[in-house]
Amino acid sequence: YCQLWDWTINALHEITEYNPKIKIALEYKPNEPRSFSLMPDVSTTLMAIKEVGNKNMGVVLDFAHVMYADEMPAYSANLIGRYSEILGVHLNDGYGKWDNGLMVGSVRPIQIIELLVELKKLNYKRAIYFDTFPDHSGLDPIKESSTNIKTFKRLNKIADKLINNSDLNEAISNQNASQSFDIVQEYLFK
């Protein structure tokens, strides 16, 4: 594994050195059913980027991969924003045991809202796109895409209202989970 890590870091260094104007994105994922992942989580990925040492490397944050890695999406986004750069966001959803690729907000709408709030705090202006698998469940891909867009717009409007909500910010500062949850639900279930 150490040799594999060294080869990977050296290859990424060579790739990023080739043209420093081109951004190179890493997308971490815990594993696949029959394979091991060298960068299974945000911490390992950020460590790799630091070791590569070039500014043109960042991270694609995939919501389902973050859940699969047992991470909190907003916290992972914050760490990436602090130590590197978010170069893309895959919005989808899942149960956290596999890369489900479900429709946006179908399982974890509150975590998606929290992620969207964090992305706004980070002044994220790059692409947000959907990494879902309509073909796995026989859905019409056009209808599913339309539903993803509609849901994203709804959740993003809620995030816009929550980012500067003084009651929510106070509840968070006081670590009052009940009050925070009540405030978010008030907007989510209007």
Regions found by a protein language model. Name each.
Residues 1-58, 68, 178-189:
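Active-site acidic/histidine proton-transfer and metal-coordination neighborhood
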Residues 24-26, 57-61, 87-91, 126-131:
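Hydrophobic faces of well-ordered beta-strands that scaffold small-molecule active sites
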Residues 3, 20, 72-75, 137-143, ...:
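Alpha-helix capping and helix-coil boundary motifs
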Residues 156-190:
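Extended, intrinsically disordered, low-complexity segments
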Residues 139-162:
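C-terminal helical cap(s) of enzyme catalytic domains, especially alpha/beta-barrels
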Residues 4, 8-11, 15, 115, ...:
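Alpha-helical packing segments of well-folded alpha/beta enzyme cores
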Residues 35-46, 65-125, 133-147:
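Gly/Pro-rich active-site loop or hairpin
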Residues 14-24, 51-57, 115-125, 155-162:
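A structural motif corresponding to the C-terminal end of an alpha-helix
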